[in-house]
């Protein structure tokens, strides 16, 4: 009661973390009775954080309040933009989860790296593990790391950067970022990667394409979202 009396007449500002990211639109690029795919902007969480409530999952639950199961099937880092898939009912979720587990969903990312890549394509196979002394960073570790494989190909080259198409075969945390930056990978960090390279306006990593079999119709679906950097 005393504190309430003291605060009377004072304007208490709302915690800015509660509305963090709400100025970033998240367009729906595909929807039906089973699935929703959105183009997540860079700077928006995939799921709610400890302090930040706004997220792709929160927005989907608000957009589809009658869905029997708005479930996120995979995640993107907060600084990564691009395609995220949600299921809207338990049956679709079970069938799509099976595809993700069996690695039947094909994902293609587009990234810009610092430097000019000499070869036109290749495969990076470096095991990854959390760097517990410097989280959330991940590190290459032959002893405790989990198998991680990335296929890459060059799209374009400029004087100082290279645009790549990246296809992760596995889905480890920061896999694409570490595989590009590590000396045993490409040895070239992504543009704007504050964890493994040099900080910039934004991370140049975008989830560009999803290819999968529809859980109900069994039709092969391909969805793309244009790069915005």
Task: Spell out what each predicted region is.
Residues 1-229:
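RNA pseudouridine synthases
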């Amino acid at each position: 009661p005393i504190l309430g009396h003291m605060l009377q007449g004072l304007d208490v500002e709302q915690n800015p973390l509660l509305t963090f990211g709400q100025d970033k639109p998240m367009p729906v690029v595909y929807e039906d009775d089973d699935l929703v795919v959105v183009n997540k902007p860079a700077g928006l969480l995939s799921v709610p954080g400890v302090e930040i409530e706004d997220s792709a999952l929160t927005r989907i639950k608000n957009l589809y309040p009658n869905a029997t199961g708005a479930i996120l099937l995979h995640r993107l880092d907060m600084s990564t933009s691009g395609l995220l898939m949600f299921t809207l009912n338990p049956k679709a979720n079970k069938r799509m989860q099976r595809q993700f587990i069996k690695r039947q969903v094909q994902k293609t990312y587009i990234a810009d790296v610092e430097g000019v890549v000499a070869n036109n394509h290749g495969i990076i196979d470096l095991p990854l593990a959390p760097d517990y002394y410097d989280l959330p960073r991940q590190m290459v570790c032959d002893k405790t790391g989990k198998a991680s494989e990335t296929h890459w190909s060059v799209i374009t080259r400029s004087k100082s950067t290279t645009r790549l198409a990246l296809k992760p075969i596995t889905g480890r945390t920061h896999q694409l970022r570490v595989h590009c930056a590590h000396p045993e990978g490409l040895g070239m960090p992504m543009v704007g990667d504050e964890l493994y390279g040099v900080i910039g306006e934004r991370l140049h990593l975008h989830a560009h394409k999803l290819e999968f079999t529809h859980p109900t119709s069994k039709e092969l679906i391909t969805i793309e979202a244009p790069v915005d950097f």
